[in-house]
Regions:
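Hydrophobic residues within beta-strands of alpha/beta enzymes
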Residues: 1, 46-48, 114
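Canonical radical SAM enzyme core domain
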Residues: 2-38, 52, 90-98
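Active-site-adjacent beta->alpha loops and helix N-cap segments on the catalytic face
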Residues: 2-8, 55-71
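Auxiliary Fe-S-binding modules of radical SAM enzymes
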Residues: 10-18, 40-41, 64-151
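A structural motif
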Residues: 40-43, 47, 51
């Protein structure tokens, strides 16, 4: 897994050294040697999505763990990542205070960029959309995120 990500970054650099690179990686189960491969490839942004709030992680991300994802982002930042990025989806039953807690958790591990988007159900086999979040609510979270130091 991580070898392919790192080789892809290096291949793009060889073809176009001026390309800004962002990688969106899985947690690699928190295995440091896999994370180090990504760090050694040196993309400008390393992204690993939390996907949801702590309470819903087990339901939404069957193989992932909330704290392991935070640990991955922290490890990346502490070991030389230029910028780290993460994102969550809304509309699956999360509460405002849980979203704010996730923002705080991400800032605590040094994450600089956060995206928040609307969850859209890919198929009937996936969890249903419980709410379509309004643009005004997204604007509110954007303002809060900027106040918390996200770019």
């Amino acid at each position: 897994g991580s070898i392919i990500w790192a080789e892809t970054v290096r291949a793009v650099r060889r073809m176009n050294p001026n390309t800004t690179m962002e990688t969106l990686i899985p947690d690699f189960q928190g295995v440091e040697r896999n994370l180090n491969r990504i760090l050694e490839a040196a993309p400008e942004i390393i992204s690993h999505n939390m996907e949801t709030v702590r309470r819903l992680t087990r339901e939404v991300r069957i193989q992932a763990k909330y704290d392991r994802s935070l640990g991955v982002l922290k490890y990346l930042k502490e070991n030389g990542a230029n910028r780290t990025k993460s994102g969550i989806m809304l509309g699956i039953g999360e509460r405002r205070e849980e979203i704010l807690e996730t923002m705080d958790d991400l800032r605590e591990v040094g994450c600089e960029v956060m995206t928040i988007g609307q969850y859209l159900r890919p198929s009937a086999a996936n969890i249903p959309v419980l709410e379509y979040v309004t643009p005004e609510t997204f604007d509110s979270y954007r303002a809060i995120g900027l106040d918390k130091g996200f770019s």
